[in-house]
Amino acid sequence: MLLDIQDLDVSFRTDEGEVVRAAVDVNLTLDRGEVLGLVGESGSGKSSVAMSVARLLPSPPAFYPKGRVLFDGRDVLKMSLPELRAIRGRRIGVVFQDPIGSLSPLHRIGAQLVETIRLHADISGAAAKAMALDWLGKVGIPEPAVRAEAYPHELSGGMQQRVMIAMALMLEPDLVIADEPTTALDVTVQAQVLRLMRDLHRANSAVLIITHDLGVVSQMATKLAVMRQGRVVETADDPAAFFASPQHPYSQALVREARRMELD
């Protein structure tokens, strides 16, 4: 099993010393060739769980009262910082919900992509640049050579999101964590990006998609989990069966709302 989350609690300590429980007793598994859709409304805890997989939550204020996050048999929560840096990017790629907060404002887009590639792959600068431009094209960015010379603030939100997606996918990691990956994208580019992610999991990688969009889940997921108020309330190994007959009242409400929006 590539990813095995066991009895995970994620909590945050406020400035006043209060403890807020973001996720409680979460158990999830994800193997190579699978796509897990983790769905729920804002504040349900899904992003806290997903970011814990690569231990990306700031600590403090985040902490883990109990549980394990096993990635390829090793507990991420017990890894040293050098061990974490070795797997982030190369073995675990992350598409963040807020791209502008994840890209350096001081460096050009192309330079950031090249740096990421050369940090994890033993290739020349020229080869890394060619690879970066190729991936900018793959995620639907026109004139990749021109855009590569831009700074993040010179790109639209949708363009920034596509850069983040290229950065996460280009090293073909074992696991991709995508937090609302298509929110800022138009329908055409969204389809293009989802196709790239499908190709990746078919190449024996795993994908964890965090979203409130059940349409994305229906297109992508091979299994899904529904979160509400920090807890997993329903899981399904057959998404089609889930959409046909969700069991938990909250899941039923989500599916009803998705159908209503389709009709609108």
PLM segments and residue spans:
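Conserved ABC transporter NBD signature motif
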Residues: 64-75, 234
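Helical segment within the ABC ATPase nucleotide-binding domain
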Residues: 191-203
